[in-house]
Amino acid sequence: LLDPLTATTMYDVEQTTSEAVYAQIEKDLTEAIPALPASVPASTESGRLTKGAAQAMLGKVYLFEGKKMEAAAVLAQVNGTPGAANQYGNKLLTNFSDLWVVANKFNTESLIEVSHTSAGNSDWGFWGSGKDEGNSLNVMVGPRTYSKPAASTAPDLPSGWCFNVATQNLYDALKSDPRFGATILDIKALKAAGEADYIGGYQDTGYFL
């Protein structure tokens, strides 16, 4: 959709091809990159897209389309030298697990980050109408009825709906990866050790992201 819909045209929109959609995505990002700032004030504009963020998005689009040479060229503008900051000041954090620490919002490794708020006038009664201003994903994938004893060292997690649990195959594929401990949480093991409790949902494995 390139033009606003009206009450008379909204029912006559033709479905276009995926190729046309991706061509438009490429066009939008290519035109936006020169106009975007290299950085934004962290205190007032965190979350706003920057030049590097748009380049990273364009690179991922190229990869999805199989355009490897184009992807390599644009991502080279974002990656920088291994171990050092890129031209926009982004660099990997020393510890992978620090990515998930609440105090590390909008850190140097973050190219694109969505800011959520709990201060909006919204609740679950408005589900699906666009008035939910929090991070619903945490609720969807959180362990159902999660709780832990006061003296437990288990992490503080929101109780959720137990959707999209990590599969056994994913667990097995990642267990030798150095990032494993900060990626998959075995709540089933925590429950067996008396450190936490939850109720398993559909296709429960006990593994949560």
Q: What does each model-identified segment do?
A:
Residues 1-49, 65-70, 209:
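Aromatic-anchored glycine-rich loop motif in surface-exposed flexible loops
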Residues 22, 30, 48-208:
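An aromatic- and glycine-enriched ligand-binding surface/loop that stacks and positions planar moieties
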